[in-house]
Amino acid sequence: MKKVLIAALIAGFSLSATAAETIRFATEASYPPFESIDANNQIVGFDVDLAQALCKEIDATCTFSNQAFDSLIPSLKFRRVEAVMAGMDITPEREKQVLFTTPYYDNSALFVGQQGKYTSVDQLKGKKVGVQNGTTHQKFIMDKHPEITTVPYDSYQNAKLDLQNGRIDGVFGDTAVVTEWLKDNPKLAAVGDKVTDKDYFGTGLGIAVRQGNTELQQKLNTALEKVKKDGTYETIYNKWFQK
């Protein structure tokens, strides 16, 4: 009987240890170069590689699930995942719902439109601009530019397709993301200057964890500091942003 009890305790301990070593990340994988689905149906991108590097530092295993952007924080709250890494801006509004790590990427936003058609945001008055539903980009336009008609999309890739096909007049998104579009499509161009309003786009992008989970927050912060110091962060950055 003792052997059975000991075996059961060991088995229970092993299961707990295994669970503790796995960090389930949720993301929205239609946002290259931060995250996207590759030809092998795998989630890849800057965020994924960085998360893997952080997990390696803290001896954890990372798993990734793809979800709609507006379901990411609810998934975190309902404990379906331990962390969210999805090009998410650290904003005061979101900080009321989740804990963020220190910023891992400095961020700004940018309008894009058809080349030669618009040169300033003022010219988008009365026009249709695509945004991803539930993002700070959507809220920014609704609050600061009510004269612009926002068209919500479940992914920025769908918004880009509609822009290219003339169904909308512009798209508003993270500078790093839409700049990649400009490299691949000479028919698109930036409209106006970068937007850096901290009330909406915060102090950068962060990894979100549940409120109260300061242990995981600290582990990720420590790991992030290490990979920035040892050159790992720079290597990952250059892989995705210096092509």
Curated annotation (Swiss-Prot):
Pfam families (UniProt xref): SBP_bac_3 (PF00497)
Coiled coil spans: none
Domain of life: Bacteria
Gene Ontology biological process: L-arginine import across plasma membrane
Any one GO MF annotation of this record: ligand-gated monoatomic ion channel activity
Signal sequence range: 1-19
Protein keywords: Amino-acid transport, Periplasm, Signal, Transport
CDD domains: PBP2_Arg_STM4351 (cd13700)
GO CC term, one of those recorded: membrane
Primary localization: periplasm
Protein location: Periplasm
PANTHER family: ABC TRANSPORTER ARGININE-BINDING PROTEIN 2-RELATED (PTHR35936:SF20), MEMBRANE-BOUND LYTIC MUREIN TRANSGLYCOSYLASE F (PTHR35936)
Cited function: Part of the ABC transporter complex ArtPIQMJ involved in arginine transport.
Subunit structure of this chain's protein: The complex is composed of two ATP-binding proteins (ArtP), two transmembrane proteins (ArtM and ArtQ) and two solute-binding proteins (ArtJ and ArtI).
Family stated for the protein in its record: Belongs to the bacterial solute-binding protein 3 family.
Protein name: Putative ABC transporter arginine-binding protein 2
Species this chain originates from: Escherichia coli (strain K12)
Lineage, broadest ranks: Bacteria, Pseudomonadati, Pseudomonadota, Gammaproteobacteria, Enterobacterales
Gene that specifies this protein: artI
